[in-house]
């Protein structure tokens, strides 16, 4: 009789633990879903835009560039050097002129 009680107790204990974990997992999942919804409502589209709006790798100032495919940063433009750099026969990234 004692062994049957021990077996029943063990089965009840195992069921209690597994059901309790299932409840914790579902509560955690629902909390995560609520947090994602709150984040989406607070920040909206701004997060998605800023995530993809970062400028890709680009060249800085006074760096050689290809005039056919310039990959200078947005505030620079690919121009033929003037003055001291004319003998290099290459284009360089220079700050855009205002005006």
From Swiss-Prot:
The modification Serine amide is found at residue 98. Pfam families: Toxin_22. It is found in: Secreted. It comes from the Eukaryota. GO terms for cellular component: extracellular region. Residues 1-22 form the signal peptide. One of its GO terms (molecular function) is toxin activity. Disulfide bonds join 58-73, 65-78, 72-93. InterPro entries: Toxin_22. Keywords: Amidation, Cleavage on pair of basic residues, Disulfide bond, Ion channel impairing toxin, Knottin, Neurotoxin, Secreted, Signal, Toxin. Expressed by the venom gland. The keyword Ligase does not apply. Residues 23-57 form a propeptide. The presence of a 'disulfide through disulfide knot' structurally defines this protein as a knottin. Insecticidal toxin that shows strong lethal effects on American cockroaches (P.americana) and common mealbeetle (T.molitor). Possibly acts by blocking ion channel currents. Also shows significant analgesic effects in mice models of pain including abdominal writhing induced by acetic acid and formalin-induced paw licking tests. Belongs to the neurotoxin 14 (magi-1) family. 08 (Ltx-4) subfamily. This is U1-theraphotoxin-Tal1a. It comes from Tliltocatl albopilosus (Curlyhair tarantula). The lineage of its organism: Eukaryota, Metazoa, Ecdysozoa, Arthropoda, Chelicerata.
């Amino acid at each position: 009789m004692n062994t049957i009680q021990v077996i029943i107790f063990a089965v009840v204990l195992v069921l209690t633990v597994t059901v309790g974990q299932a409840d914790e997992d579902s509560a955690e999942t629902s909390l995560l879903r609520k947090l994602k919804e709150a984040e989406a409502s607070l920040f909206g589209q701004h997060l998605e835009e800023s995530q993809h709006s970062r400028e890709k790798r680009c060249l800085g100032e006074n760096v050689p560039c290809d005039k056919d495919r310039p990959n200078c940063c947005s505030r620079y433009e690919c121009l033929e050097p003037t003055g001291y750099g004319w003998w290099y026969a290459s284009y360089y990234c220079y700050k855009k002129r205002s005006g």
